Regions:
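Amide-donor transfer/coupling interface in amidating biosynthetic enzymes
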Residues: 7-154
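Catalytic helix-loop patch of NAD(P)-dependent Rossmann-fold dehydrogenases
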Residues: 4
Length: 154
């Protein structure tokens, strides 16, 4: 558990440009985060079964793959709608207490200004790559073959 909540829209960068999961990603891309827990990047790096594919200097590992590519772990929220962090911010304000505005989210860091949606194209590309390269292309046409694959991989 972190001392301070990570939330806002953060810059990320790919670490392994040749992997299909990040095909087409920009050198820098943005992803929303909203969490009170950290991710131990050093522990992940020491695990030979896992690879950090993309990360942020501020939030740590973002996309992590297992060695076979059958598991993809994403620590941010690329699926967020444009107003998700705004709703969360106003909800937390209504509860009272110490509430900090989400980072890099509102234009000019002004809650009354527009929301800057910088993650949409990245989100579509991430989900498209995952479905195409890790689900569709790895699922056999004959579903009986899929059952055989599952029983032999145990």
């Amino acid at each position: 558990i972190l001392n301070k909540k990570i939330w806002g829209v953060y810059e990320h960068h790919p670490l392994h440009n040749k992997l299909p999961i990040i095909r087409g990603f920009d050198d820098k891309f943005y992803v929303p985060h909203s969490r009170n827990t950290g991710v131990d990047g050093e522990a992940i790096r020491k695990n030979k079964e896992l690879t950090i594919v993309a990360e942020s200097d501020e939030t740590g590992p973002y996309i992590i793959l297992n060695s076979t590519g059958s598991q993809v772990f994403v620590t941010g929220h690329p699926e967020y709608d444009p107003d998700t962090l705004d709703k969360e911010y106003h909800r937390d304000l209504a509860k009272g207490g110490d509430c900090v505005m989400p980072k890099n989210y509102y234009k000019n860091d002004d809650v009354n200004d527009e929301i800057l949606v910088k993650w949409r194209s990245h989100a579509y590309l991430l989900f498209s790559n995952w479905l195409n390269y890790y689900v569709y292309q790895n699922t056999p046409y004959n579903l009986d073959d899929l059952l055989k694959m599952k029983t032999t991989n145990k």
